[in-house]
Structures are given as structure tokens and as C-alpha cells.
UniProtKB/Swiss-Prot annotation:
SMART domains: DNA_mis_repair, MutL_C. GO terms for cellular component: mismatch repair complex. It comes from Methanocorpusculum labreanum (strain ATCC 43576 / DSM 4855 / Z). Keywords: DNA damage, DNA repair. PANTHER family: DNA MISMATCH REPAIR PROTEIN MLH, PMS, MUTL (PTHR10073), DNA MISMATCH REPAIR PROTEIN MLH1 (PTHR10073:SF12). Belongs to the DNA mismatch repair MutL/HexB family. This is DNA mismatch repair protein MutL.
Length: 588
């Protein structure tokens, strides 16, 4: 007797439904996407729940609707109006196309489907009632144009799937996330989400990205974003990303990416976004990103996953590069201080001050009112550190340089911008950004290093000695020239041109440690070397500065390409607006 049997239609339907309908959010996704494809302008989603779980789901739209016959045909497996031949799969522009959703949902729930075709002269709409895949009724009723789908008793005939549904709050969170993602990709449509009859979420179909982001995440969050846009041949990118220095998260939960209007998940594109941030992104942190990517539909294969959340791109590397470039360009054009002209400050005045002139001590807001003579020697060393980065040509900047007010704890610079907002600057992080940018600009050039008058011998560990020969080219690109001088002893003959003190043994050991961490990737090794060198050569915290020195430091910071973060991604600057201060003091 044959053990191989052809499955009956009911079993086949349940298997298919298991692939398409995982939870309540899956039902919402399929029905809302159908409404989007139906040219709806308003989509209302209703969720009802009690202690047992989600009990009802409804989706109502004002789309094109269906006639009496199509309403019934839509529940047949693989019945669709969106494709008709294999060639159509090569250029899909709709969110749905397989003709599986309604049949799969109807197989594991009780469905009431009401629809009226747009522009129909008939006053009647079609209503189809199906329970567990079995047709209960097909009748004419009165209803407005568009479509309304009511799902009752989800998974009532599949107890195994119902058993594995999570708590109501968890399932609701998945529904909210799904609706929010679709709304972010379809900003010209108004979405309304109700839970147990109460409105929980609404967008207004204005077409504006900031409007939808504000509706989903709040107006405060939307103000922390900066726009991204770019055209790279057939690839077009538009959206918003977290401004450097704003709140980041340790998880990747705020990547909202769409390709040709379809929300997708892509680790490759998430990686490209983070690469676009580069040193502006703190280690281990993730930005928020809302990006629309438009491609030729023929370059996108959406028929690779049951839920269509994953897609395959024929030109994936090119798209990744475009995303990375768009993010990078946006971040380096962003300005958060001011676009007003800088105050007149002759460059000659900055670069020709005698080293021994250190200026008057500044008020210290931490409580000390005077600086003792014993602190003047460190001030002279500080002056030398500041001049290392002033010796290079500074690019012109249209940014207003904040006016220095004082210093807190010999570590933070207080200033105010043109709008009167309070600016707090970490002096070490700021100077580190300046130094890193200058080291990076000189790297791999003949101007990267300067020979020491007296070469500096340094004794290395066995590990350092073994690794150093493979690192010499990278170190040379950074400005370091080291030559062997006996067993485990090397002679430092050249250091980065911005600072001769970068040849001291402690700094060399720190740089070698950083380089060893990045062995195998030349660019990463060089970047680590430059970051370490920058950190070691600049003004530290707990260092008193004069008003003049702080003003010069801010001017140098404003002239960098990325003034808002240090090379490691930590913020250099915090802006306390007047409105934010008012809120902190509970002023209305």
C-alpha cells in the first residue's frame, strides 16, 4: 500500500496559512498592504482584545474596491489582479502579488469581507462570509465604496498556532510596529489605528516624512533628525537619520528601510548606514534611520520570502555604496550651531601670538575664582598643544563661533550661540576631533611626518617586535618612521608633523597596541593609529584654559568637517536650548 498521499485542500490551506500568517500582525500587514495597492487614501485598522488575546481585527479603506464576482474569486488560492504571467515577476510594483493572503487568512479564521467598486452605479456592495475556508454566504448589502475586512476568531481551528501567541501587549506591539512601518513608507495615505475602540495612532496623509515620524515617535524625537537625499544614477535615496550627538540606541530596532515603497529588512543596508556615520557613531550604538530607496523594479526580487520582508538586489553593492555616500554627505553638510557669519577674527592674530603669552585666567564656574602661579607652567604647555593644530591651514567656515562664557571643572567649555542657547563643549573631545582631522588630511602624503632632531630609542615587547614589520607601511602613512636598532629595540626617527611629542615611548606603545587590534585591515589599522595619536597629543580634561584659548579652540572645531563628535563617536558638544532649560525648570 502506498505511503505517499496527496494532501487534501484543507490541509494544504493550513500549511500555506502557516507560512503567511504567523500572528495578528501578519494579518494586519497583508490586509493593509492590499488596501495600499487598492489606491486607498484613508485606511482604518481596528484591534479588539480581552484577557484571552486579540479577538478581532478590522481593516477598512476607501480604495477601488471589487465587483460582486471578484469579491468571491479573491478568496481562491493564487487569485490576484496584480500579475498574470511569469514575466510580471521581473518588475513588481505592488506590495502584494501572489494571491495567497486572503485565502490563507480565511483558512484559519472567520472572515466577513464587504466591498464596493469605486464608481459603481449599483447602490449595493458585495459581502462574502467565510469560516475556516468554507463559504458561508455571498450576498449583496448596502455599503460605501471601498473595502472592509473583519477577522474574527483568528487561529480558532489551529490550536497549535493559537497556543504560541504571546501576551496581548506583545502582540499589540507587533501590530503597532507593522502599521508604523507601512505608514512611514506610504506618507500620502492617512492611517488610523484603534484599540478597543480608542484611537492610538494616526497619520494625516500629508506626504511629509517629518509629519509621519512625529506622529509615530513624537515631535521631540523628530527634531533630532537630519535629512538624507541623493541620486546616484538609477538609485534614488530620501529620508531622515539621527543627527550626531542625539540619542542613540544599543539595538538595531529603529532602522526603517523601504525599497520601492516596500518595508524591508537588510543587514547589508544597515551596515551601509553605520559606515556612512563613520567616527560620528559611538561604538556599540545604532542610529535611527528612515530611508526610502527607489530602484528599477527589475533590479529587485521580492519573491524570495513568504512575508516579502527580505528582498534580493541584483546590484546590492552599488546600492550599499549609494546609501553610505548619501548618509556621509548628509552628516557632513549638517550644521547645528548657526549659519550666521563668523565674527571678524583675523587668522594672523591667531597664528602669530607668542607662545609665552597665555592670556588671563578665566572665571571657573566650579567655584575657584583665581589661578595660582603654580598653574602657569601647565598653561604654557597647553598653549603649545593648541598651536599644534593652529599651524595648519584652517578651512573657511560659515558657522558662527559660539561666544565663550567660561570653563567648568577645567574640563568643559561654556559658550552661547547666536540664538542664546547654552553650549557645553568637552575640550578634550573637541581638540581630539581637530587633531584627528589634520592627521587624516596629511596621512599617506610626504607631509605626514617630521624627522626628529634626536631619534628616540624604544624597547618593544616580543609581541610588538614580531608584529611591527607588517605595520611599518601603515605607521609611515601616519607619519611614523621606525628602524630596527638591535634586539627588541627600535629607533623612532619621524613622528606626525603636528607634534614632536608623539614620539615618546608611552605614545608609541599605545599606538602599537591600537594597530595590533586592527591587524588584517590596512584602513582600520591606520584609523586606529590616527585616533590614538590624536588622543595623546591634545589638551586633556582637568586643564585650565584662558578665554582666548577656548575661543580659538572653538574656532578650530567649527572649521572641521565633523565638529559634533570626537573620532571615537562621542559627542564634543551638547546644546541646551532655552526651551529645554525652561522645561528643566518646569517653566511653562
Amino acid at each position: 500500500m502506498s505511503r505517499v498521499k496527496i494532501l487534501d485542500e484543507e490541509t494544504i490551506s493550513h500549511i500555506a496559512a502557516g507560512e503567511v500568517v504567523e500572528r495578528a500582525a501578519s494579518v494586519v500587514k497583508e490586509l493593509v498592504e492590499n488596501a495600499v495597492d487598492a489606491d486607498a487614501q484613508i485606511i482604518r485598522i481596528g484591534i479588539s482584545a480581552d484577557k484571552t488575546g486579540i479577538t478581532k481585527i478590522s481593516v477598512t479603506d476607501d480604495g477601488i474596491g471589487m465587483d460582486f464576482d471578484d469579491a468571491l474569486l479573491a478568496f481562491r488560492q493564487h487569485a490576484t489582479s496584480k500579475i498574470s504571467r511569469p514575466e510580471d515577476l521581473d518588475g513588481i510594483t505592488t506590495l502584494g502579488f501572489r494571491g495567497e493572503a486572503l485565502a490563507s487568512i480565511a483558512a484559519i479564521s472567520k472572515v466577513t469581507f464587504t466591498t464596493k467598486e469605486r464608481g459603481s452605479p449599483s447602490p449595493e456592495a458585495a459581502r462574502v462570509v467565510i469560516h475556516g475556508g468554507e463559504l458561508i454566504s455571498h450576498s449583496a448589502v448596502g455599503a460605501p465604496e471601498g473595502t472592509s475586512v473583519l477577522i474574527d476568531a483568528l487561529f480558532y481551528n489551529t490550536p497549535a498556532r493559537r497556543k504560541f501567541q504571546k501576551s496581548v501587549p506583545t502582540e499589540l506591539s507587533h501590530v503597532y510596529d507593522m502599521v508604523e512601518r507601512i505608514a512611514l513608507s506610504n506618507r500620502n495615505i492617512s492611517f488610523v489605528l484603534l484599540y478597543n475602540g480608542k484611537e492610538r495612532f494616526q497619520t494625516f496623509g500629508t506626504g511629509s516624512y517629518p509629519d509621519v515620524i512625529a506622529a509615530v515617535f513624537g515631535s521631540t524625537f523628530s527634531k533630532e533628525l537630519t535629512p538624507v537625499s541623493g541620486s546616484f544614477g538609477p538609485v534614488k535615496i530620501d529620508g531622515w537619520i539621527t543627527r550626531p550627538g542625539s540619542e542613540m540606541k544599543t539595538t538595531q530596532t529603529r532602522f526603517y528601510l523601504s525599497i520601492n515603497g516596500r518595508q524591508v529588512t537588510s543587514r547589508q543596508l544597515q551596515w551601509a548606514i553605520r559606515e556612512g556615520y563613520g567616527t560620528l557613531l559611538p561604538k556599540g550604538m545604532y542610529p535611527a534611520a528612515f530611508l526610502d530607496i527607489v530602484l528599477d523594479p527589475r533590479d529587485v526580487d521580492v519573491n524570495v520570502h513568504p512575508t516579502k520582508r527580505e528582498v534580493r538586489l541584483s546590484r546590492e553593492r552599488e546600492v550599499m555604496r549609494c546609501v553610505q555616500d548619501a548618509v556621509y554627505t548628509s552628516l557632513h553638510e549638517e550644521r547645528v550651531f548657526s549659519t550666521a557669519p563668523m565674527p571678524t577674527l583675523a587668522r594672523e592674530t591667531i597664528t602669530t601670538l607668542p607662545v609665552e603669552i597665555v592670556g588671563e585666567p578665566v572665571p571657573v564656574y566650579a567655584g575657584k575664582q583665581e589661578m595660582h602661579e603654580a598653574r602657569q607652567a601647565p598653561l604654557k604647555q597647553t598653549e603649545k598643544q593648541l598651536r599644534r593644530t593652529e599651524s595648519a591651514d584652517l578651512p573657511e567656515t560659515d558657522l558662527f563661533v559660539p561666544e565663550v562664557l567660561g570653563q567648568i571643572g577645567d574640563t568643559y567649555i561654556l559658550a552661547k550661540n547666536e540664538s542664546g542657547d547654552l553650549i557645553v563643549v568637552d575640550q578634550h573631545a573637541a581638540h581630539e576631533r581637530i587633531m584627528y582631522d589634520q592627521l587624516l588630511a596629511r596621512s599617506s602624503s610626504a607631509e605626514a611626518g617630521q624627522e626628529l632632531i634626536v631619534p628616540q630609542p624604544i624597547t618593544l615587547s616580543k609581541k610588538e617586535t614580531a608584529a611591527l614589520p607588517d605595520l611599518l607601511d601603515v605607521l609611515a602613512a601616519a607619519g611614523y618612521l621606525l628602524e630596527p636598532f638591535g634586539k627588541d629595540v627600535w629607533m623612532v626617527r619621524s613622528v606626525p608633523v603636528v607634534s614632536s611629542t608623539l614620539g615618546d615611548p608611552d605614545t608609541i606603545h599605545a599606538i602599537l597596541d591600537a594597530a595590533l587590534d586592527g591587524v588584517g585591515n590596512t584602513d582600520e589599522v591606520l584609523d586606529r593609529v590616527l585616533k590614538t595619536a590624536a588622543c595623546r597629543a591634545v589638551v586633556k580634561g582637568n586643564t585650565p584654559l584662558t578665554i582666548e584659548q577656548m575661543q580659538r579652540l572653538l574656532r578650530q572645531l567649527m572649521a572641521t568637517k565633523s565638529p559634533y563628535t570626537c573620532p571615537h563617536g562621542r559627542p564634543t558638544t551638547i546644546v541646551l536650548s532655552k526651551s529645554r532649560l525652561a522645561g528643566m525648570f518646569l517653566r511653562t
